Amino acid sequence: MGKIIGIDLGTTNSCVAIIEGNKPRVLENSEGDRTTPSIIAYTQDGEILVGQPAKRQSVTNPKNTLFAIKRLIGRRFQDTEVQRDVNIMPYKIISADNGDAWLDVKGQKMAPPQVSAEILKKMKKTAEDYLGEQISEAVITVPAYFNDAQRQATKDSGRIAGLEVKRIINEPTAAALAYGLDKETRGNRTIAVYDLGGGTFDISIIEIDDVDGEKTFEVLSTNGDTHLGGEDFDSLLINYLADEFKKDQRINLYNDPLAMQRLKEAAEKAKIELSASHQTDVNLPYITADNTGPKHMNIRVTRAKLESLVEDLVNRTMEPLKVALKDANLSVSNINDVILVGGQTRMPLVQKKVSEFFRKEPRRDVNPDEAVAIGAAVQGGVLSGDVKDVLLLDVTPLSLGIETMGGVMTSLIAKNTTIPTKHSQIFSTAEDNQSAVTIHVLQGERKRASDNKSLGQFNLDGIAAAMRGIPQIEVTFDIDADGILHVSAKDKNSGREQKITIKASSGLNEEEINKMVQEAEANAESDRKFEELVQIRNQADHLLHSTKKQLTEVGDNISLDDKSAIEGALKELESVIKKEDKNEIESKIQSLIKVSGKLLEASQKHQEQSKSQSSNSTSDPNGEVVDAEFEEIKNKK
């Protein structure tokens, strides 16, 4: 087997590493750098530039120089975060025919995976130049909180670049691999990996167990924000500088793409300098001009000013830390080491906040720019057999399930479940003689199905005619080692099966994901009341169905007065079943039960007489049938 390279496909910078002589090695690109800017430029003569060459010409070609593409991968054009990027990016973001966020480069529509593939090609070429052989396989990292669509899009990007992606690995987990293999400590250690990169933020709690030289890396929990990173820090500083210039010169730089591109580079440079010094000057001669002549920018920025601008962003990373610890059933005192990953963690304010939260200093012996690529190379070495005695156990970041009766999400796989994993559950039909069901797949933490992320749906038809609750539909969720979901539904009676790999058309933005978990906690009482309401509605629906059936079968065996009272109670219950008042529904249920005594007696007598015929149709061999709300698909032939 050939080399499997490890690639950190970053928002701001990318990096490639290999295993050489049982040790990971970060490779230098053709410019002699160990990291490559994740920037792609399309020149007027049709040339495609990647990395530093693309960055150097960005000032003169801002509309065709693409950066931070990772923020768009697997996302919808109408996403709030994408719309924000539409307004601030110098290049053109458009809506694809299917609603995805794409790019317009010189009139040509391009998908984010297609653009990201250019960076992967550069990483592939870097490895090939060093090794002197063709490379066709890679392990690529993604943020831990990337959803299924974003992972799929990353794999697509690898395929476009001519790489078979052997594994998608979470960035904090990769960093833990790099850290863990480099340490000679024995026994269990629990580490927190705080990963604040150019466009995304992740926190993972990972246990490293070393027994007789064999190391197991088990992810206990993960959390994060897929649209928060260094680019957001840069934007705040850019806006501050542009606003200060406008106050001083009364000129709006926002309308000048060339000026804004220069300002972006200067802001990024100033931010980096302020990690080492307490003040810096942003000097941009001839940034613009008006009828009085050329204008120059000269603004002094202090570290204190920068920290005041970005403090809210840093504070936004604190809540996921609390959730991750809670999900892992740990406290701060259980954390042995804190690892910082991502270039933005070089900011003193970030280090200070993380140190205060965990009550210990972060490790200084892990390179935040290279650790993720090294970990990816280690995983590649494990897959190829070059690295022995390493076992990696990762998790899925959000719960997965389907919509069931009453609009409830029934979870099949809970968040932070170790992957790969597989789980099956038996469901049934909601109507008599229902010939087809629709499986609606959801991702999230809320009880109400509509409050979660819809990943897609598919149909299973050809179900044999039967009373509701009799057919047995086995729904299976299977998450592979890349965290990608495969769903199947099988009619156990006929053996008919339908399966799909979920390929959601849109990514989960940070607001959606964080809201799912936070709202589930903040609105626990609301969710509990909703569950109770659904349960009472389902009870009412079952009672309506069984009472109507009994009326049809033995209604002639009771008095007209009893029959009239039952029909009246049925109408009253039907009139309130859709209301939000649980007590009113419960009251009408009791009223119907009260007037249905004679009908129940007649039905029991009828059942005793026909017991031998009805026993087959009412048996439930598994005893674990869950009513599910499936829509019937009409035959349109």
Curated annotation (Swiss-Prot):
The keyword Lipid metabolism does not apply. Keywords: ATP-binding, Chaperone, Nucleotide-binding, Phosphoprotein, Stress response. Residues 600-637 are annotated as: Disordered. It comes from the Bacteria. The modification Phosphothreonine is found at residue 200. Induction: By stress conditions e.g. heat shock. It holds the Pfam family HSP70. Residues 610-619 have a biased composition (Low complexity). One of its GO terms (molecular function) is ATP-dependent protein folding chaperone. Acts as a chaperone. Belongs to the heat shock protein 70 family. HAMAP family: DnaK. This is Chaperone protein DnaK.
